[in-house]
């Protein structure tokens, strides 16, 4: 069975490695370059009701910005593409494995984690104009999932230790002054105003999402899922959150309010969808799914969907895995 490279922290796995026992529902999905048509409403494999597909596509209301992701062209490299399907660019092409890239608030650079040696992950920032990457950390631990704050001054990230435990940290944009702000968590993302951080943790037993203040105070639980994984995002206006939940090969993206109200399944059932990220205008969500290659470990592609659950589009179509997308300007 073909497999992708995985991280050493078990809680931070974004892709499943066990194959399904039953085939998924058959879906017809348009590519991003195709003329859009309404996407049919499907019955989810959940008690929750998915958003219904009723809106129509308007060219003026199409996706904008860029999406950066891990592409397994050769190993785990970084790629970027415009949200309208143009401008594909491979950012890295070296033996180092790269993961968890995200765009700076102004879209000028990406930060990411690189596996530079056995159990050594460092955080880098690459300028998108020059293509030059700069190492920001040095032997701080297993560092993954970096994200730059909305004001561009700080970076939050996950730090793992040799025992597999993970923590939420924050440092200056240049890598100075790293500080632990929470002792048990992973996959952090900033609130739109930069005063809070959303992250996953099992501090109360099961995996759930929590919010903590920038200074590490007032950690509080947000969700009540049964099989949450971790990767999440906060909408630009602060009104919504997204994450993914479910057992292996049956994961779905869910959208909800910061108080966990108005919960609904966003993705159609049967794709094993995960790793969501909002568009800069808050109208779309990108995610990884296996709709077209269900059951194949290397069958993951990048998709986008409107926040009302309509207009599902495939952004990539490759013989290798594309995953961990993050949307930026």
Regions found by a protein language model. Give the residues of each.
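Sequence signature of WD/YWTD-type beta-propeller architectures
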Residues: 2-4, 17-329
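Sec-dependent signal peptide hydrophobic core
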Residues: 5-9
């Amino acid at each position: 069975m073909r497999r992708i490279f995985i991280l050493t922290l078990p809680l931070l796995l974004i892709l499943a490695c066990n194959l399904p026992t039953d085939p998924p529902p058959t879906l017809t999905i348009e590519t991003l370059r195709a003329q859009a048509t309404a996407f049919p409403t499907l019955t989810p494999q959940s008690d929750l009701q998915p958003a219904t597909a009723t809106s129509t596509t308007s060219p003026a209301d199409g996706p904008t910005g860029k999406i950066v992701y891990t592409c397994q062209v050769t190993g785990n490299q970084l790629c970027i593409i415009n949200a309208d399907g143009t401008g594909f660019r491979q950012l890295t092409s070296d033996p180092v494995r790269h993961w968890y890239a995200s765009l700076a608030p102004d879209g000028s650079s990406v930060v990411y984690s690189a596996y530079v040696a056995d159990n050594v992950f460092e955080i880098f920032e690459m300028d998108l104009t020059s293509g030059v990457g700069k190492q920001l950390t040095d032997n701080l631990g297993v560092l993954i999932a970096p994200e730059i704050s909305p004001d561009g001054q700080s970076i939050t990230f996950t730090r793992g230790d040799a025992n597999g435990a993970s923590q939420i940290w924050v440092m200056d944009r240049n890598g100075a002054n790293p500080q632990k702000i929470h002792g048990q968590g992973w996959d952090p993302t900033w609130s739109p105003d930069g005063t809070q951080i959303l992250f996953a943790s099992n501090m109360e037993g099961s995996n759930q999402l929590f919010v903590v203040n920038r200074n590490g105070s007032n950690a509080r639980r947000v969700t009540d899922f049964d099989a949450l994984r971790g990767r999440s995002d906060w909408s630009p206006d602060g009104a919504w959150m997204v994450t993914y939940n479910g057992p292996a090969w049956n994961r779905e993206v869910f959208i909800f309010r910061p108080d966990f109200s108005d919960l609904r399944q966003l993705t159609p059932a049967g794709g094993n969808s995960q790793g969501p990220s909002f568009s800069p205008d808050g109208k779309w969500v990108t995610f990884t799914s296996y709709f077209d290659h269900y059951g194949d470990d290397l069958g993951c592609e990048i998709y986008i969907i409107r926040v009302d659950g309509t207009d599902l589009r495939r952004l990539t179509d490759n013989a290798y895995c594309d995953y961990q997308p993050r949307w930026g300007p």
